[in-house]
């Protein structure tokens, strides 16, 4: 390369790397020249990250005298320029920053890129041999640093893009491997099923039927549990009702006792009251025959009392005055309900006078009819329970209605009753 006035010019380099400086004749560092050649080879083969761009033809002498600060081509606004001469040298445009296709992964490429990075790092260090370009502007150093940053970002993006497909390929291989294993297991199971004899299949079906049958009671239990809970709640409510009923019964029983005592006192002064009521009752009259009617004339009072609990039983008390038939003044007939639900009847034995024992049964149309006084001593006849129920539920609550029938109606009208008469109520509220 000669001066500005004469001589032929040496041809410029066809391509310059973005990250290297020119190897001029005055540059004493041969290693840097080798690095520059390596970067040029990389640009020519397309293995680098940036493509080399051909330089424009040399300018005419008139154009050479123009200052180096002339504006460049707007199309080349993104290119970097390096001053080639000293005071009056021309500007050499360098390669544009354009992304290149991803390089092939090899040791040579890695070494070239490392050498290029070293040259970039050394390009802006102070005290390096400067050759032709002794005064490198700050813009060139900034451009070189920017190029190195862009190269690092490009490398990171390539690593990310390379990791994604590799990972997806690995996942696809795992999925394919699992599907293949499942298909092999299904084939093996099918072979095992085919190899099983018919007897084993029948046993398996029977076992399934037994298991399903064993689960059915559990479902019934699930249905029975709410029903049992409801029944327990109902039992508790019934128990509360029983307790409340007992309390009310004791309360109103004391109030009724006063009226019952007054009623009994009046009945005792009416001769033949109870025998008239018994004989006028439509269900009790068939049992009163001959001698029974004569003995009932001596009844002075009748009391019906329930036991401590209304549902545990009741007690009948018959009061007699002195008579020629038996010696008892009080005969008691009691019915008691045991815990098992069985009803047991007890009675006071009658002490008969000699020659006045009543007939136990009266035969009518080949049917055995219970005698009224036999009801006290015989506890096996079903009609004895019927007599107790009639006396308790019908006769005792309101004996006056049966006394006033037939002949007693006229007498009741002539002599009005001054004492208050109790309104008929269920037997449960008539305890004394």
Curated annotation (Swiss-Prot):
Gene3D superfamilies: 1.20.5.1500, Nucleosome assembly protein
Post-translational modification: Ubiquitinated by the CRL2(APPBP2) complex, which recognizes the Arg-Xaa-Xaa-Gly sequence at the C-terminus, leading to its degradation.
Pfam families membership: NAP (PF00956)
GO cellular component terms, semicolon-separated: chromatin; nucleolus; nucleoplasm; nucleus
Example GO BP: nucleosome assembly
Chain intervals for the UniProt region annotation (Disordered): 1-31, 54-110, 116-135
GO molecular function: chromatin binding; enzyme binding; histone binding
Chain positions of cross-link Glycyl lysine isopeptide (Lys-Gly) (interchain with G-Cter in SUMO2): 160
Subcellular location: Nucleus, Nucleolus
InterPro entries xref list: NAP-like_sf, NAP_family
Top-rank taxon, per record: Eukaryota
Keyword set, alphabetical order: Isopeptide bond, Nucleus, Ubl conjugation
Record-stated family: Belongs to the nucleosome assembly protein (NAP) family.
Protein name (database record): Testis-specific Y-encoded-like protein 1
Source organism of this protein record: Bos taurus
């Amino acid at each position: 390369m000669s001066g500005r006035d004469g001589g032929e010019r040496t041809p410029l380099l066809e391509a310059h790397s973005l990250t290297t400086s020119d190897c001029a004749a005055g540059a004493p560092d041969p290693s840097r020249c080798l690095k520059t050649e390596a970067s040029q080879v990389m640009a020519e083969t397309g293995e680098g990250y940036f493509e080399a761009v051909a330089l424009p033809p040399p300018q005419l002498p008139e154009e050479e005298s123009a200052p180096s600060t002339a504006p460049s081509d707007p199309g080349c606004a993104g290119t970097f320029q390096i001053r080639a001469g000293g005071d009056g040298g021309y500007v050499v445009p360098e390669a544009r920053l354009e992304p290149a296709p991803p390089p092939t992964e090899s040791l040579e490429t890695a070494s070239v890129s490392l050498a290029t990075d070293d040259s970039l790092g050394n390009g802006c260090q102070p005290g390096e041999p400067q050759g032709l370009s002794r005064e490198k502007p700050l813009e060139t150093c900034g451009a070189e640093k920017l190029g190195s940053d862009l190269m690092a970002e490009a490398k990171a993006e390539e690593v990310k893009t390379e990791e994604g497909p590799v990972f997806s390929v690995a996942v696809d291989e795992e999925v394919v491997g699992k599907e293949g294993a499942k298909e092999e297991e299904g084939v093996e199971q099918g072979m095992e099923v085919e190899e099983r004899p018919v007897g084993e299949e029948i046993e398996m079906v029977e076992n399934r039927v037994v298991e399903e049958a064993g689960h059915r009671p559990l479902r019934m239990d699930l249905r029975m549990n709410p029903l049992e809970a409801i029944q327990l709640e109902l039992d508790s409510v019934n128990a509360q009702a029983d307790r409340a009923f007992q309390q009310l019964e004791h309360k109103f029983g004391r109030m009724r006792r006063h009226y019952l005592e007054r009623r009994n006192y009046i009945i005792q002064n009416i001769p033949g009251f109870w025998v008239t009521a018994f004989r006028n009752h439509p269900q009790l009259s068939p049992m009163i025959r001959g001698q029974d009617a004569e003995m009932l004339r001596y009844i002075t009072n009748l009391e019906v009392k329930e036991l401590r609990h209304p549902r545990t039983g009741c007690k009948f008390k018959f009061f007699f005055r002195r008579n020629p038939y038996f010696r008892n003044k009080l005969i008691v007939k009691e019915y008691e309900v045991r815990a098992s639900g069985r009803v047991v009847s007890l009675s006071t034995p009658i002490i008969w006078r000699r020659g006045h024992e009543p007939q136990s049964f009266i035969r009518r149309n080949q049917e055995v009819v219970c005698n009224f006084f036999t009801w006290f001593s015989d506890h096996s006849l079903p009609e004895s329970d019927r007599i107790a129920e009639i006396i308790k539920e019908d006769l005792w609550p309101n004996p006056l209605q049966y006394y006033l029938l037939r002949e007693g109606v006229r007498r009741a009208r002539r002599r009005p009753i001054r004492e208050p008469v109790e309104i008929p109520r269920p037997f449960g509220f008539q305890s004394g």
